[in-house]
Amino acid sequence: VLSAADKAHVKAFWTKIGGHAGEYGGEALERTFLSFPTTKTYFPHFDLSPGSAQVKAHGKKVGDALTLAVGHLDDLPGALSDLSDLHAHKLRVDPVNFKLLGHCVLVTLALHHPDAFTPAVHASLDKFITTVSTVLTSKYR
């Protein structure tokens, strides 16, 4: 459960991202594909080469979803319900992949904002991304 301090850290950090959430999402997705090649199996129709327009476009969706989640920290299940349905029932993404992508999101954020990525912020962002992953996989059960 995200504490008030966690929510404050996440919101404050997200303001530093500005309009780069989509760009960072694309970078995190590319990093996921490179670091965890088995994640590519869900994208057989994509050009997965570095800098691919398809990876960038899907990464923007990831960034936009995280931005949506930041705006609804008190109701993540409600805000992410449609995405949860999509990933559980239509796309059938293995839940472990959310953890892998979440790790790559954290790495990407830390690389772009090292001064703001303090241990406390890191812990809060990790809890946030874990909570988002839990919500997205909640309809698998």
Curated annotation (Swiss-Prot):
The modification N6-acetyllysine is found at K16. The modification N6-succinyllysine is found at K7, K11, K16, K40. One of its GO terms (cellular component) is hemoglobin complex. The modification Phosphotyrosine is found at Y24. It holds the Pfam family Globin. CDD domains: Hb-alpha-like. Heme b binds at H87. One of its GO terms (biological process) is hydrogen peroxide catabolic process. The modification Phosphothreonine is found at T108, T134, T137. Heterotetramer of two alpha chains and two beta chains. Belongs to the globin family. This is Hemoglobin subunit alpha. It comes from Bradypus tridactylus (Pale-throated three-toed sloth).
